[in-house]
Amino acid sequence: MSVTTGVVDLRSDTVTRPTPEMRRAMADADVGDDVYGEDPTVNALEETFAARVGKDRAIFVPSGTMGNQLALRLLTRPGDVVVAGARQHVVIYENGAAARNAGVQFHAVDDDDGTIDPAAVADAVDTAAHHHPRPGLVCLEDTHMPANGSPWPIERLRAVGAAAAAAALPVHLDGARLFNAEVASGTAAAERAAGATTVMCCLSKGLCAPVGSLLAGPAAVMERARDERQRLGGGMRQAGVIAAAGLVALRTMVERLADDHGRARRLADAVTERWPGAGLDPAAVRTNVVTWAHPDPSALVAHLRAEGVLAGTIAPGVMRFVTHHDVDDAGIERAVKALASAP
């Protein structure tokens, strides 16, 4: 449980607090004006991340949503359609930003298992021949949050990447929890992002940084990224103060994600024991997200809150737990106990 509040907060991994090492790094950060490209700590973070995901360059942005929207602006033109899974963050959790900011719409395809069929790319191209909008981009999400944070099988990632390449379409990888996928699969982030033109990753989820995400891609694309970031209001000044925490996150917080994954599996077992018909297979919980069906989420949320456990929903009738650095084994057992007596 949180050593700060005494509450077991499983609503999201965005509630994590910066570690003591991050706070020290933030206090001591060497800074400059990042809009001029003169913040050495931001520059170091961007270079570190780009190397980690196998791309030429990266840019630091305030949020994952901005990173995704920036990719859409860089890789599409107004009027395009983006081929994406129907439950992906960029499709349903960004307040319609794609239409507003990039002038695009989605060709949403089935992603119930957390992936999309490579054939969906060719289907979208074929559909466009019949007076439909032109496909301009394929967007993927790894891990796929609504599908219990499932990491894509690497063979499937490669197959979709190959299908996009055959159709001459760029690929954007929403890797908000990319390093959870790396740890769970044993496949390096750079390999997982190899078929993507651009890749975004959040530092402020399981990696515990207080704020910030990164978008990386080829030099030819990223040359325009600063201008597009400015149009979205994302230019920051002495951002090294927060970038310093991101450097610590990439250095110290990735391997320990395995602890979060094990704790999520413990919760999944408890949920299945309490509600065998909830549609949750504990074996499908490979990272830090647990989702299940419940007939009265508001009653369950209230019960858990009364027991000192915070949970949330992601859709009508769908509950969610997300494990993270700030919830330890004792916190998990408290949640398990609360579940046993839940309505």
Feature names for model-found ranges:
Residues S2-A29, D33-H294, S298-E307, A311-V327, ...:
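Conserved PLP-enzyme active-site core in the AAT-like
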